[in-house]
Amino acid sequence: MTKALLTILLLLSIMPSMAEVSRENAPLSLLNEIQYSPNLTTAGQPSEEQFRAVAEAGFQRVIFLAFTDHKNAVKNEDRIARSAGLEFVHIPVAWDAPTTDDFDTFAAVMRATEKTLVHCEVNFRASVFGFLYQVIYLGTPAEEAWALLTRIWIPNETWKTFIVSALAEKGIEYPGV
């Protein structure tokens, strides 16, 4: 009886830390969420409430890739993210004209190892940037990263051209996935 009671007390004492570990790796239930790696998740626009959940899940930084005037933008997103304890980085990427300079700016921010949520309006821009970062900087096979990306959408010609250009600029041939 005493041994069983001690076992129960031991289990109860470690359960909060086990919950913390599972919360840090659990999906956030964000629009079109993709977890590319433990430190890189992309998604569509989070709500004000979801920014707190992002911080509670162990993220340290949010990168916003859309413009602040899109119809689903959260007003004062920068202040909301900061008040949740998140670093906020805004890299506005034109939907119809993404540039490799946009991606290079993104990659420079990503080189720090903080757990990062990258988002835009519906996770189209962000998923492409996540794909490119995984392939170019983390050595993820293109087919593997592409499979994650295409769970959300099939890039249109503008974005396929951008992908080819960004890969070519880094000396990587587009695998035609």
Language-model regions, residue ranges each:
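Positively charged n-region of N-terminal signal peptides that target proteins for export
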Residues: 1-4
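N-terminal signal peptide c-region/cleavage motif recognized by signal peptidases
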Residues: 14-15
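Cys-dependent protein tyrosine phosphatase-like superfamily
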Residues: 18-117, 128-177
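Short cysteine clusters
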Residues: 120
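Substrate/cofactor-recognition hotspot
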Residues: 123
